[in-house]
């Protein structure tokens, strides 16, 4: 069973029925769900909820998509801090380092369209995109 951390852009694609990425993001998340479990970090959930009408709506959507909320934990936060401390941010916001650290600590891979995560060179972070999964 493979655990997949889901990034914000995938959720937005699905909920907004994005004409360019919506169908591929939905197909990718469905495939990942068939292969194992889906999780999301506190940062992703908070950013997602900010775009919803209410916290209840955000939680309902995540439950419908079978995306489980998992705390980052001490190890995930430490990984994020270590990587951020060693590297220039390269324009990345700190939340991105927390999302990457969360994925390293709790998942086998991170599903995202933001391929900048791969360029972060976070040890142990496996980045997959809808395009790479569905190719």
Language-model features, listed with the residues they occupy:
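Acidic, PIN/NYN-like endoribonuclease modules and their adjacent C-terminal/linker elements
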Residues: 3, 100, 104-135
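Short loop->beta-strand "edge-of-pocket" segments that line small-molecule binding or catalytic clefts
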Residues: 4, 37-40, 65-70, 109
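Conserved glycosyltransferase catalytic-site signature
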Residues: 8, 42, 95-97
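A generic structural signal for short hydrophobic patches within well-formed alpha-helices
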Residues: 11, 45, 117-118
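A short acidic, often aromatic-flanked loop/helix-cap motif at beta-alpha or helix-coil junctions
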Residues: 46-47, 75-79, 132-135
């Amino acid at each position: 069973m493979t655990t997949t951390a889901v990034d914000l852009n995938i959720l937005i694609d699905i909920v907004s029925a994005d004409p360019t990425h919506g169908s591929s993001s939905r197909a990718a998340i469905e495939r990942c769900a068939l292969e194992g479990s889906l999780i999301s970090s506190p940062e992703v959930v908070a950013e997602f909820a900010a775009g919803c009408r209410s916290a209840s709506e955000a939680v309902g959507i995540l439950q419908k998509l079978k995306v489980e909320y998992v705390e980052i934990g001490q190890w995930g936060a430490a990984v994020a801090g270590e990587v951020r401390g060693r590297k220039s941010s390269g324009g990345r916001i700190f939340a991105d380092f927390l999302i990457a650290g969360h994925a390293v600590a709790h998942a086998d891979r991170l599903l995202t369209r933001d391929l900048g995560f791969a360029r972060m060179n976070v040890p142990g972070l496996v980045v997959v995109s809808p395009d790479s999964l569905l190719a």
